[in-house]
């Protein structure tokens, strides 16, 4: 077989870059273990929001707003601001074509109150046919002009891939078959040890490995797909892409758009490959590389084979020019084919059209089209006339409709069609306006703590909306002051947990931590020499058995059987019992400080000595007890080239010169006892811990960020959070997004340990922050599924604090029960009249019930992002809807802290908000459908059934209840407490957030304390002034 000409480097790079750019509208998709919320339209954020949703609907074949009936339900519940609805309708009506006698606002109001969700405009309808139907007349008799009808069909087909175009005209399933075939190949390649079969050659990359297998693949052979014809002629994915595109006759100027269409068909897989190819730390990506161009090449090669196979059996086109020729030479046939397979054919005519197409012949098709098309147009006209009559009656404009000319009717249809694209946006704006009013009605002028008043405890929570209820209840049950901060607490942590074999990242997904924290048994004294040996084992072995070595396979099977019955019949009791028998992990502490050079050198020496002992046993069968420390030291010095000549190995064990030389070489090359590798190890050890300067900086930044620079309590709780669920592939979606979809406890422990250090506090005192000696930073974990708060690292608690521990726990437990009592009725409507203790028990049961598809609502109904002092909103019951970010503009003279909040938590909050927005409006396409049909794919993703696109959004159970939306899709409303010009400068400085606000992706409010706490709402490109906030009542303030 003839090999195509190899592409030169320049052309290969152009193909790769075109493929990369074509995939940019698709957002990254992280593995399910670290579910990260992201805006599904992230790749379109450079556009205004309203323009982006139109483009997103085209790209992802998805709905961007809910059906009208859902918004009408919320309107009846008082969640839609009526005057905003009227204002938006009036404003948009001005841009519609003027039609005599048509009062556009009245018609549009009637449309939005229609009892039907269906579109008011019938696709492809002609105004003269509507006019005739309105007046009970038959349509005008005129010959069907194929040349007039073809351009619309041609334009539609040119927006499709060639397999999709063939499907549209022949009713085949080429595009679906293509998806199914490549998904199976993707599963084989990307599998992370879930499958018992391993695709060979994966280390060479996706396309190379797949092309080797595909040429002898049974699925391809049985399907009679001759991929070998193409694969035998190409050398790499880039040449495969070029070959296929040229074989299909696609104009090079259209390649980028064609690639985008291909890549968005399975945008979950595309998003995963886009993320994976950029994740340099991801083990599987390094071991088995894959790029977007690989993904595209596989699709194109299989797609071409499907086209060729279809051409052999049905004489369908393989090249674009063949399709164009078919449209122009056999236009009537193409129109009939499209009518038959579009799902819009008149039922009585389907069989006749099918028979005629089977018999063929241009004249036969032309004759049938002349008979069928007028009937179809007449039916369209009648359907449109009926819809207009109903709408006119609702608008009290029947008389105005009846006198319209065909030209006027065309203008009416055009206007209604244009408004139909905007209706969802109008509903959304009116809901957001109501939400803004509700927020401004509840927040109040903030008040500082009375001078000298010291709360019993202060607690830092993640900004996550699920923290709002428990913060509110904690403040009301006792003398507690709470703060909100991003859940990684500003400290990116690389973490090597006790008994774990690989590093985990606890920080936002877009950040790579520079520092590594080790978890060690608490009984180890950091000053003891044994710690160095322990570190050597941790860095060398990286393993710890969960079950004792003598536990047999049968015992594990028995435990699984107990799981099956226990989790099903008595989930709560069984969970408690299982936790007791699994509690083999010792109490631990974290190694947060940097190692000294002497410690690092000692660890490396320990590792090298261990490797020499291992080598002696493996290579020369010499046991440890037969060698002494001096011999090991001598071998180490020789391997490092610090000494020359024979070693005691020869004299003691009779090893020859050659054997000794080979052994020394193996020590260097295989066991890495080598000076160069020692330098590398030294660099790696340099990642362990944080320097004193770094620790001071992290603690200082966190304190000033939340405005806590004085009046410290005895207890300062740093509360991370995570969810708890059983049998749920999406469990990481319930954890802390700021920690990369993991628990926030590690970060809380790290920051608390830093803040409790005397050296750190001394440096902070010199920076104007004086933390009292009796203040203790205590890490804790908020379980968002049960609302329990568990204190951590109590072994480090100073004895003088123990007397207050019961009071602290009692307050936390009371707040947790009250929060559960608030949350359970939202989760289970039958639990409305429930006591806090009952709600607490119910929440714990749901958390361990493996049949429970919705143990909590997650972040559903999130809508607000509040940046300001807690006292601004602490008297408000915001129902778990705001991201609460503590901030005091008076502690931020240059605005840098506000800029950081806007650049990180606000942007992440917007991602979360729009993940919920789009997962709600089209759960089938932009969400992930029902959990009931989910299956784990390759241990990295979730599919619906056994074969589907990777499901990247939120499951229906997270955003829907009984088939109706539970989440209310609105854009995030970000409220900032700061002077207007101060906040404006910060918004201008953070380019990304400026773009999001100006583009309408975020709704912004500024409450200006220098102008009597007057709110300013950013709307239509300008700041709109609102009445000042009310001050809290005197008795409230005194309390």
From Swiss-Prot:
Keyword Cell membrane: yes
InterPro entries: DabA (IPR018752)
Localization annotation: Cell inner membrane
Zinc as UniProt keyword: yes
A single cellular component GO annotation: plasma membrane
Location, primary (coarse class): membrane
MF (Gene Ontology): zinc ion binding
Membrane topology note: Peripheral membrane protein
Cofactor: Zn(2+)
Residues annotated for Zn(2+) binding in this entry: 462, 464, 721, 736
Alphabetical keyword list: Cell inner membrane, Cell membrane, Membrane, Metal-binding, Plasmid, Transport, Zinc
Quaternary structure, from the entry: Forms a complex with DabB.
Its biological purpose: Part of an energy-coupled inorganic carbon pump.
Family to which this protein belongs: Belongs to the inorganic carbon transporter (TC 9.A.2) DabA family.
UniProt-listed PANTHER family: INORGANIC CARBON TRANSPORTER SUBUNIT DABA-RELATED (PTHR38344:SF1), UPF0753 PROTEIN AQ_863 (PTHR38344)
Protein name: Probable inorganic carbon transporter subunit DabA 2
Natural source organism: Nitrobacter hamburgensis (strain DSM 10229 / NCIMB 13809 / X14)
């Amino acid at each position: 077989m003839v090999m195509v000409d190899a592409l030169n480097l320049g052309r290969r790079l152009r193909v790769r870059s075109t493929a990369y750019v074509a995939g940019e509208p698709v957002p990254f998709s992280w593995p399910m273990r670290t579910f990260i919320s992201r805006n599904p339209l992230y790749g379109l954020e450079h556009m205004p929001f309203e323009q982006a949703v139109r483009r997103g609907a085209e790209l992802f074949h998805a709905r961007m707003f809910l059906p009208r009936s859902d918004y009408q339900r919320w309107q009846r519940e008082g969640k839609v601001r009526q005057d905003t609805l009227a204002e938006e309708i009036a404003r948009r009506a001005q841009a519609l074509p003027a039609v005599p006698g048509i009062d556009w606002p009245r018609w549009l109001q009637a449309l939005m109150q229609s009892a039907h969700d269906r579109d008011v405009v019938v696709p492809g309808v002609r105004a003269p046919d509507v006019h005739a139907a309105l007046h009970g007349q038959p349509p005008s008799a005129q010959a069907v002009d194929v040349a007039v009808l073809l351009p619309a069909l041609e334009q539609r087909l040119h927006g499709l891939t060639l397999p999709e175009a063939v499907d549209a005209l022949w009713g085949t399933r080429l595009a679906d078959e293509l998806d199914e075939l490549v998904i199976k190949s993707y599963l084989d390649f990307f599998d992370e040890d879930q499958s018992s079969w391993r695709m060979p050659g994966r280390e060479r990359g996706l396309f190379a490995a797949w092309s080797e297998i595909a040429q002898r693949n049974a699925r391809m052979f049985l399907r009679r797909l001759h991929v070998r014809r193409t694969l035998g002629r190409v050398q790499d994915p880039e040449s495969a892409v070029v070959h296929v595109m040229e074989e299909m006759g696609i104009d090079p100027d259209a390649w980028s758009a064609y690639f985008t269409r291909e890549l968005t068909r399975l945008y979950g897989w595309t998003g995963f490959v886009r993320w994976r190819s950029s994740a340099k730390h991801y083990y599987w990506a390094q071991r088995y590389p894959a790029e977007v161009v690989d993904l595209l090449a596989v699709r194109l090669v299989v797609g071409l084979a499907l086209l060729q196979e279809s051409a052999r059996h049905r004489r369908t086109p393989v090249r674009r020019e063949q399709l164009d020729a078919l449209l122009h030479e056999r236009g009537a046939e193409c129109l009939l084919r499209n009518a038959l397979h579009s799902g819009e054919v008149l039922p009585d005519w389907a069989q006749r059209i099918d028979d005629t197409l089977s018999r063929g012949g241009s004249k036969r098709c032309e004759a049938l089209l002349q008979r069928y098309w007028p009937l179809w147009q007449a039916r369209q006209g009648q359907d449109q006339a009926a819809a207009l009559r109903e709408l006119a009656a609702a608008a009290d404009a029947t008389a105005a409709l009846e006198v319209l000319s065909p030209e006027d009717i065309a203008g009416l249809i055009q206007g209604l069609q244009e408004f139909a694209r905007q209706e969802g946006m109008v509903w959304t704006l009116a809901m957001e306006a109501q939400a803004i009013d509700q927020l401004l009605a509840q927040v109040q002028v903030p008040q500082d703590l009375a001078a000298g008043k010291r709360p019993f405890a202060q607690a830092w929570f993640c900004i996550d909306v699920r923290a709002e209820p428990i913060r509110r209840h904690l403040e009301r049950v006792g003398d507690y002051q709470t703060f909100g901060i991003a859940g990684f607490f500003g400290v990116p942590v690389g973490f090597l947990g006790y008994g774990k074999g690989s590093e985990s990242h606890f920080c936002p997904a877009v950040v790579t931590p520079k520092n590594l924290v080790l978890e060690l048994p608490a009984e180890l004294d950091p000053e003891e020499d044994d710690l160095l040996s322990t570190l050597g084992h941790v860095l060398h072995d990286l393993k710890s058995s969960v079950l004792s070595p003598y536990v047999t396979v049968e015992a594990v099977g028995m435990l699984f059987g107990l799981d099956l019955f226990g989790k099903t019949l008595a989930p709560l009791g069984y969970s408690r019992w299982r936790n007791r028998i699994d509690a083999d992990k010792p109490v631990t502490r974290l190694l947060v400080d940097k190692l000294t050079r002497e410690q690092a050198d000692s660890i490396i020496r320990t590792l090298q000595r261990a490797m020499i002992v291992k080598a002696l046993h493996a290579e020369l069968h010499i046991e440890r007890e037969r060698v002494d420390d001096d011999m090991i030291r001598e071998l180490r010095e020789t391997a490092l080239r610090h000494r020359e000549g024979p070693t005691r190995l020869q004299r003691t064990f009779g090893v020859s010169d050659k054997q000794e030389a080979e052994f020394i070489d193996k020590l260097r090359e295989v066991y890495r006892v080598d000076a160069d590798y020692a330098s590398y190890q030294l660099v790696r050890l340099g990642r362990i811990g944080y320097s004193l300067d770094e620790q001071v900086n992290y603690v200082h930044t966190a304190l000033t960020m939340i405005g806590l620079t004085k009046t410290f309590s005895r207890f300062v709780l740093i509360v991370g959070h995570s969810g708890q669920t059983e049998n749920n592939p999406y469990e990481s979606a319930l954890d802390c997004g700021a920690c990369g979809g993991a628990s926030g406890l590690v970060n809380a422990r790290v920051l608390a340990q830093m803040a409790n250090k005397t050296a750190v506090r001394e440096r902070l005192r010199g920076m104007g922050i004086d933390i009292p000696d009796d203040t203790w930073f205590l890490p804790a974990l908020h379980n968002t599924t049960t609302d329990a708060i568990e204190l951590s690292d109590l072994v480090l608690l100073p004895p003088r604090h123990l007397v207050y521990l019961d009071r602290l726990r009692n307050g936390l437990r009371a707040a947790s029960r009250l929060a559960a009592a608030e949350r359970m009725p939202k989760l289970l409507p039958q639990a409305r009249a429930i006591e806090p203790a009952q709600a607490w028990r119910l929440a714990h049961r749901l958390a361990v019930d493996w049949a429970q598809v919705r143990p909590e609502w997650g972040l559903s109904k999130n809508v607000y992002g509040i940046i300001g002092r807690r006292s601004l909103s602490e008297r408000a019951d915001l129902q778990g809807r705001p991201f609460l970010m503590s901030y005091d503009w008076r502690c931020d003279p240059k605005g840098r802290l506000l800029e950081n909040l806007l650049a990180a938590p606000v942007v992440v909050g917007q991602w979360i908000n729009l993940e919920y927005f789009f997962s709600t409006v089209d759960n089938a396409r932009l969400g992930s459908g029902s959990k009931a049909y989910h299956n784990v794919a390759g241990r990295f993703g979730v599919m619906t059934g056994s074969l589907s696109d990777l499901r990247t959004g939120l499951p229906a159970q997270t955003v829907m209840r009984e088939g109706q939306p539970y989440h209310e899709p609105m854009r995030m409303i970000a409220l900032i407490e700061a002077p207007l010009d101060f906040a404006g400068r910060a918004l201008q400085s953070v380019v990304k957030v400026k773009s999001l606000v100006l583009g309408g992706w975020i709704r912004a409010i500024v409450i200006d304390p220098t102008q009597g706490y007057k709110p300013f709402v950013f709307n239509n490109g300008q700041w709109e002034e609102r009445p000042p906030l009310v001050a809290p009542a005197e008795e409230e303030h005194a309390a």
